[in-house]
Amino acid sequence: MYPAHLLVLLAVCVSLLGAASIPPQPLNLVQFSYLIQCANHGSRATWHYTDYGCYCGKGGSGTPVDELDRCCKTHDDCYTEAGKKGCYPKLTLYSWKCTGKAPTCNSKTGCKRTVCDCDATAAKCFAKAPYNNKNYNIDTKKRCQ
């Protein structure tokens, strides 16, 4: 083997090792973002909901700061209940469509239906709830006790 080939092989191995340490993104969250866009008609980018209040985004504690944050807490609770039924909400993919500018679940039964219902209900709740910029990226240690 030529030295240049060894360098290429080494570079590939190093890049694969680096990629192995990157945690995978839950597949369902991509689908959930599409449901949100369907429900709010694209009026607000999905990332606006990833660090909002005490419950929108990773984790959650304390009292929700407003109606939108309550939507996120309800969604978290729905995922918890789905998990108790043996579902893996963040990994469960389901069938849905955007009808009448609202997400509709096509999956009929089981975990796919349960998780889709959680996501569709949350997406519709997000679309109806007012968005308060002051509740984006708040200090959760102070406000979410």
UniProtKB/Swiss-Prot annotation:
Entry's family note: Belongs to the phospholipase A2 family. Group I subfamily. D49 sub-subfamily.
Statement: the UniProt record of this protein carries the keyword Signal: yes
Major enzyme class: hydrolase
Protein name according to UniProt: Basic phospholipase A2 S10-58F
A Pfam family annotated for this UniProt entry: Phospholip_A2_1
Binding of Ca(2+), residues: 55, 57, 59, 76
E.C. number: 3.1.1.4
Positions of disulphide bridges: 38-98, 54-144, 56-72, 71-125, 78-118, 87-111, 105-116
GO molecular function list: calcium ion binding; calcium-dependent phospholipase A2 activity; phospholipid binding; toxin activity
Keywords attached to this entry: Calcium, Disulfide bond, Hemostasis impairing toxin, Hydrolase, Lipid degradation, Lipid metabolism, Metal-binding, Platelet aggregation inhibiting toxin, Secreted, Signal, Toxin
Gene3D superfamilies assigned to the protein according to its UniProt record, in alphabetical order: Phospholipase A2 domain
Cofactor annotation comment: Binds 1 Ca(2+) ion.
Active site per the UniProt annotation: 75, 119
Cofactor list: Ca(2+)
